[in-house]
């Protein structure tokens, strides 16, 4: 976290003005918290291999569609929760519903990023978990600046975005979109 504070402080300070909102990607927060794991070091169990076979593959990213990312979901969220989420998804898929696995598994599962070719090395060969304590991180970053700004930790991808943490609990997507 200390390195993140130095980098954000040094490079954002000259550009920030009162009233600004500083977006910080969840991936860099998680990496600085030590929540990135080389794919070669993740040893999936049989359950991870089985469950990953049922994940819908999309052009938007690997998600939990590889055994290593599914293994990290099992560790991060707990095996019972992931099995329950898989069961719910299997049932609701029959009715044409999508996304129920991630809704039940929760934000920790949704926040897991697998390796992709467009990620900056060496993290193109890592599994990155979601950040811990994103609200606290946003508040710590806000405290760096002698300006009236807000900081949000976001997870934004091709499918949409989520505010994971904010220095201002009143700041929501709806309020932000009005800016």
Spell out what each predicted region is:
Residues 1-179:
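N-terminal and secondary-structure boundary signal
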